[in-house]
Amino acid sequence: MTVKARMLKLLEQHENELISGEAAAAELNCTRAAIWKAVKSLREEGYTIEAGPNKGYVLRGGSRLSEEGIRLYLDHPDVPVKIYRELDSTNRAAKEAAFSGEAGHGALILARRQKSGRGRRGRSFYSPENAGLYMSIVLRPDRTLKEGLLITTAAATAVCRAVKKICGIDLGIKWVNDLYFHNKKVCGILTEAVTDFESGNIEFAVVGIGLNLYMPEDGFPEDIQETAGALFENRNDAEHINCSILVAEIVNQLLMEVETPGLSREYTENNIIPGNMIVITDGARTREAYAEAIAPDGRLVVREQDGSETLLSYGEVSVRRKSDQG
């Protein structure tokens, strides 16, 4: 572990407490000059570290995000982590890295802002700076294309677990890839895969996750104002949340869950779709049906109006409003 990583860990263990350069150097078995250099680098990554003559260093809390901080809490800290100030799309960057062979299993790409964030069915995902976490994880799972839906369900489970553990917030899952809080969408997941045509196996998958942490300063665009939400009203409400830890926990949970066969119990228990009349949108066509359950392979079991049963593996679903029900 580098001096910078060890210094970050030391500061976080004593958050809001003064640590002298001399004490830090003794603890980390390095020179005070090395401590100064590590602190300078951490500040450049966005950490608020105060210092004064003969006083020492103190790390102030806040929703900081850095490559070093994420690696510190990863179960597999050797995987590549890259944070960009701005990208068109983290999924696009991750796919390019995967195609070139640069990105192995678990490689992580984040952007503080996306210019062209994407959701399912070609939709855009609003990704302003200082409002959310926008990341893509490269996976090279031993799965067939038929099992691909379980990668998305694994990602939804991973985000729910991480948000519960780090933020203390319970999220609901809307089949197949949206997460809700207080009846507002706070997270979208987009999974894209490249497969071997002959074997039917997935060569690699890219899981894009957009998580709204705080309400944007200028609010959401008019077309999503009624449906979009965030975990916290503003940054001050999330002062206790370390974004690096949250990102690392999402990755840790995803890498663990994607290796676990089948559908997680949490995905079924936290799903808000089964047991409701729903509207299914498939292209320009819509129809109503009753959502019965989530199948073991992640598909949605619906009862059509003629009484027949259908298994959905794709499509847009929404709960039919009570005012629309006869």
Task: Give short role names for the model-derived ranges.
Residues 2-164, 187:
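N-terminal lobe of the biotin/lipoate ligase/transferase fold
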Residues 35, 90, 135, 178, ...:
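Residue-level signal for inorganic ion chemistry
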Residues 58, 179-181:
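Short, active-site-adjacent cap segments at secondary-structure transitions
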